[in-house]
Swiss-Prot record:
<keyword id="KW-0560">Oxidoreductase</keyword>
<dbReference type="InterPro" id="IPR002328">
    <property type="entry name" value="ADH_Zn_CS"/>
</dbReference>
<dbReference type="InterPro" id="IPR004627">
    <property type="entry name" value="L-Threonine_3-DHase"/>
</dbReference>
<keyword id="KW-0479">Metal-binding</keyword>
<dbReference type="GO" id="GO:0019518">
    <property type="term" value="P:L-threonine catabolic process to glycine"/>
</dbReference>
<keyword id="KW-0862">Zinc</keyword>
<dbReference type="GO" id="GO:0008270">
    <property type="term" value="F:zinc ion binding"/>
</dbReference>
<feature type="active site" description="Charge relay system">
    <location>
        <position position="43"/>
    </location>
</feature>
<dbReference type="GO" id="GO:0008743">
    <property type="term" value="F:L-threonine 3-dehydrogenase activity"/>
</dbReference>
<feature type="binding site">
    <location>
        <position position="196"/>
    </location>
    <ligand>
        <name>NAD(+)</name>
    </ligand>
</feature>
<feature type="binding site">
    <location>
        <position position="38"/>
    </location>
    <ligand>
        <name>Zn(2+) 1</name>
    </ligand>
</feature>
<feature type="binding site">
    <location>
        <position position="93"/>
    </location>
    <ligand>
        <name>Zn(2+) 2</name>
    </ligand>
</feature>
<feature type="binding site">
    <location>
        <begin position="287"/>
        <end position="288"/>
    </location>
    <ligand>
        <name>NAD(+)</name>
    </ligand>
</feature>
<feature type="binding site">
    <location>
        <position position="176"/>
    </location>
    <ligand>
        <name>NAD(+)</name>
    </ligand>
</feature>
<dbReference type="Pfam" id="PF00107">
    <property type="entry name" value="ADH_zinc_N"/>
</dbReference>
<feature type="binding site">
    <location>
        <position position="201"/>
    </location>
    <ligand>
        <name>NAD(+)</name>
    </ligand>
</feature>
<comment type="similarity">
    <text>Belongs to the zinc-containing alcohol dehydrogenase family.</text>
</comment>
Length: 345
């Protein structure tokens, strides 16, 4: 079969032949239909400092995917060949304190597909049956099914705190930031304000229904307070950018008792004024991945209830044009990029 592989510790990827997978007793094999490109995949493609420290080559990339089950392991009896699925990309140990308490998203021994172990950028992907998510939404677009992983990051972050009737600030209008803002708005937030430095990404946010998109290189958040008759600041902050400047500004603009969820990962050290956090009694909650599988149930319910995230996918390519797809994904413009594997059939 074909797979998209980081063959050597240097920039670039190759679409090459690799052995077909073999299912263990508790595994399934999925015929991959679509895959999304994550920022992690871009880092590995470019072979930056993080990738050089983290990834061992050769490695099959990819953790955003959907496809059809084509084979079941001998001990798998609760899934069926032909089911349309995605998968939870975090493999957990099942034996640590968190796993035994049912908090698998907190497993200290987590391994991520596509960077710690081989991933889903391949025609046929084998994974544990316990990581498979079956899509039961009628007529779900495979492109949307392929991005349930990052959608889950957005949902997990946006729903850290109840946002009904609250004023919500989202810093970072990348795909996950926009999806988080859409979730907050869909859940009944009073005002949702999205900030970024990119007019292109803010325009995409507006096209998807987030009318309060602010370029903070030209407009300060204090003008937003006036626009929405805000007297005390934002109730909830969702920091999606990894920018120290954005986090500092968010803290400055929170109401007393405000709550911040952090998903964006800083690339450098950040200096914070802890006196503001302490005396304003601000709660800061770190977030990674998804709750397994509670977030997946929530995602499916949101889609069934009418939340439309399809517009976040702005570019689609056959896998044979992966180089163009990765160049677009790495440009920092636009939304999600999805690659189609069915062209290899």
């Amino acid at each position: 079969m074909k797979a998209l592989v980081k063959t050597r510790p240097e920039p670039g990827l190759e679409l090459v032949e690799v052995p077909d997978p073999v299912a263990g007793p508790n595994d399934v094999i999925v015929k991959v239909m679509r895959t999304g490109i994550c920022g992690t995949d871009v880092h590995i493609d470019k072979w930056d400092g993080w990738a050089a420290k983290t990834v061992h080559t050769p490695l099959v990339l990819g953790h955003e995917f959907c496809g059809e089950i084509v084979e079941l392991g001998s001990e798998v009896n609760d899934l069926e060949v032909g089911q349309f699925v995605s998968g939870e990309g975090h493999y957990v140990c099942g034996r640590c304190r968190a796993c035994l308490a049912g908090k698998r998203h907190l497993c200290r021994n987590t391994q991520g597909i596509g960077y710690a172990v081989n991933g889903a950028y391949c025609q046929y992907f084998v994974m544990p049956a316990g990581n498979v998510w079956v899509h039961h939404i009628p007529d779900l677009d495979p492109d949307v099914a392929a991005i349930f992983d990052p959608f889950g990051n957005a949902v997990h972050t946006a729903l850290q705190f109840p946002c009904l009737a609250e004023d919500v600030l989202v810093s970072g209008a990348g795909p996950i930031g926009i999806m988080a803002a859409l979730v907050a708005q869909f859940q009944g937030a009073r005002n949702v304000v999205v900030t970024d430095l990119s007019d292109e990404r803010l325009e995409l946010a507006q096209q998807l229904g987030l009318k309060n998109a602010v370029n903070v290189s030209r407009e300060g958040l204090e003008t937003v307070w006036d626009r929405f008759d805000m007297k005390e600041g934002f109730d909830i902050g969702l920091e999606m950018s990894g920018s120290g400047t954005a986090l500092t500004s968010m803290i400055d603009n929170m109401t007393h008792g405000g709550r911040i969820a952090l998903l964006g990962t800083p690339s450098t050290d950040i200096t914070l004024d802890f006196s503001k956090i302490i005396f304003n009694m601000i709660t800061i909650q770190g977030v990674t991945g998804r709750q397994i599988f509670e977030t997946w149930y929530t995602m499916a319910s949101l889609i069934r209830s009418g939340l439309d995230i399809s517009g976040i996918i702005t570019d689609r390519y056959p896998i044979t044009e992966f180089r163009e797809a990765f160049d677009v994904a790495g440009s920092g413009h636009g939304g999600k990029v999805v690659m189609n594997w069915e062209c290899l059939d």
